Design a protein with these regions (language model features):
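Intrinsic, low-complexity polybasic segments
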Residues: 3-4
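Intrinsically disordered, low-complexity segments enriched in serine/threonine/proline/glycine
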Residues: 7-9
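Intrinsic-disorder-associated, low-complexity terminal segments enriched in Asp/Asn/His/Tyr and depleted
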Residues: 11-13
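Cofactor-cradling patches in redox/metallo enzymes
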Residues: 39-144
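The C-terminal output helix
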Residues: 145-149
């Protein structure tokens, strides 16, 4: 062995022992709703759990969210929707993601979503809906399980 060249036996941080890159999550507030406290709390919890978080800010269109997802090469998109526009925004976003070849991205929705709307959102491709009162730990665990490997 040449001196100074690390091997798996001499350097515990070689590629074979490194962890995979962090899960990349885009957190967005679509629509006209200006209440972003919940989205910021989720973004911080995900970051604290070791995920890489990109927060897009308020008043994002589905087009803006899809473009940001492509640019940032994210694994997960989290939407915070309190305005009642979920039945319009979510299907539009899912269509745009598919058109951009990003239909493997996990899309989550949090906010005030009537129970009657949940089946159609899941049918549109939303992976999970988190209602008010869901713990941040439950969201972190869902994402970690979905992206374990």
């Amino acid at each position: 062995m040449e001196r100074g060249i690390p091997t798996p036996q001499t350097n515990p941080y070689t590629q074979s022992r490194m962890t995979k890159p962090p899960i990349r999550v885009l957190v967005a507030k679509p629509g006209l709703d200006g209440h972003d406290r919940g989205a910021k709390i989720i973004a911080r919890a995900l970051r604290d759990a070791g995920m890489e978080v990109i927060y897009t800010g308020l008043r994002q269109t589905p087009e803006m969210i899809a473009s940001a997802a492509v640019q940032e090469d994210v694994d997960v998109i989290g939407l915070s929707i309190l305005s009642g526009a979920h039945n319009t925004i979510c299907p539009q976003l899912m269509t745009l993601l598919k058109e951009k070849g990003m239909d493997d991205v996990t899309v989550l929705v949090g906010g005030i979503i009537p129970g009657a709307d949940i089946p159609s959102l899941k049918q549109a491709g939303i992976a999970e809906i988190f209602l008010p009162g869901t713990s941040t730990q439950d969201i972190v665990e869902f994402i970690n399980k979905k992206h374990a490997a």
